[in-house]
Amino acid sequence: MAANKGINGGIKNHFIAFLGEFVGTFLFLFFAYGGTQTANQTSQKNPSIVASPDINQLLYIALIFGFSLTVNVWIFFRVSGGLFNPAVTIALCLVGVVGPVRSIFIFIAQVVASIAAAAAVRGLLPGDTVLFSCALAPGTSIAQGLFLEMFFTIELVFTILMLAAEKTKVTFVAPVGIGLSLFVAELMGVAWTGGALNPARAFGAEVIGGFRGYHWIYWLGPLMGAVLAAGFYKVIKFLNYEQVNGEQDLSAEEKQLKDEKKARKKEERRRKQNFAGLFQTGRMHHHHHANTRNATVNDAGDGRPNSAPPYTEPPAQQQTWPHSASTIRENEDFSRFAEMGSQDGIVITREQPAEQYRLSGERYVQDANAQNRAKTP
C-alpha cells in the first residue's frame, strides 16, 4: 500500500506540473503571439512573416515577450517552475534541477500549449494571415540564423540557471531578470530570426501558419544554446564559483548558520588539541620522572648518587601530596593525569601551596631531591 501511495503521489505531482506548465505556457504565448500580431497588423497589410520591423515594432514585440514571460513565470514558478520552453527544460534536466520523468511531462505540455495559444490568437484576432511566425530576415543565411538562435538562448538559459536554479537571497525576484534577458535577446533577435529562443514558440506558430524549410534551426539552435549554458554552469559549479565573491549572496539567516557552524568546528578542534596535548604532557612527565630518578643512582649499584648526597627513601608520610579526592604515591603512573585536565592534574609537594604548581614530574623530582639532601647528615 505504501508503495502504491508513493507511485500515485508521484503521478499526481507530475500531473499538477503538467497542468501548471500547460496553462502557463499558453498564457505566455497567447499574449506574446497576440502582441506580435497586433504590432505587425497595424503597419503591414499583407505580410506573411515578421521581417525588417521598424524600431517601434521591434520595441513593442520585445516588450510584449519580455513582460509576458516575467508575469507568467512569477505566477507559475510555484506550481511547475514556470519554464515555458523546451530548451530551458532540457537545460534544467542536464544540471539535475528537474528529473527526467518530470521533464517529459513538462516538454509535452509546452509543445501542446504553444499550438493551442497560436490557434487561439489566430481565431480571436481579425485577419486571415498569421503574423507571429518566426522567419529569417532577407540576407540572413540559415547558418547565421542557427548560431544567432544559439547565442540568444544561451543568454536566456544561463540567466535562468543563475537566478532560479541557484537559490540565493534574490531568487524571489528571478522572474524580473529572466524577463529582462528575453527582452534583451528579442531586441536583437526579432529583426534577424524572429527571436524564437524557444522551440515551442516557433513550432506552435508554424503549425497554424505553415512550416518553412529551415524550421529545424528553431529547434537545433536553442537546444545547442541550452546544452552550452548548462555545461558552463556545471563547470563553474565544479570550480566552486561561490568562493570567489565570499558571502555576498547569503541571507542574514544563512550567514548566521554558517558562522555558528564554523564556531562549532573551531571549538571541536580546540577540544581535540587540548586533550591530545594533556595526554602527551602526562606521558612525558611520567617518563621524565622515571629517568630522573634513575639518573640519581650510580652504575655501581651502591645506591649513592653520582653528584649528589646519598639518596634516602623518604618516609611514607613524605611521599604523599594533596590531590583532589585521592592521595597519589610516588610510584603511581603519571600518564593518567592526562585524562584529568588542567583542573584536576595539579601535583605539588607538601611544603608548597597548591596554587603554585601544576603537573610536572621534573619539579616533583627537584623538590624530592632537595628534601632528601636537607635530611641527610
Swiss-Prot record:
Residues 36-56, 109-144, 193-215 are extracellular. The chain crosses the membrane at residues 15-35, 57-77, 88-108, 145-165, 172-192, 216-236. Gene3D superfamilies: Glycerol uptake facilitator protein. It catalyses: H2O(in) = H2O(out); glycerol(in) = glycerol(out). The keyword Transferase does not apply. It comes from the Eukaryota. It is found in: Membrane. Induction: Expression is higher in conidia than in vegetative hyphae. Disruption phenotype: Leads to a slight reduction in the vegetative growth rate and a significant increase in conidiation. Residues 278-332, 358-377 are annotated as: Disordered. Water channel required to facilitate the transport of water across membranes. Involved in conidiation. Belongs to the MIP/aquaporin (TC 1.A.8) family. Aquaporins contain two tandem repeats each containing three membrane-spanning domains and a pore-forming loop with the signature motif Asn-Pro-Ala (NPA). This is Aquaporin-2.
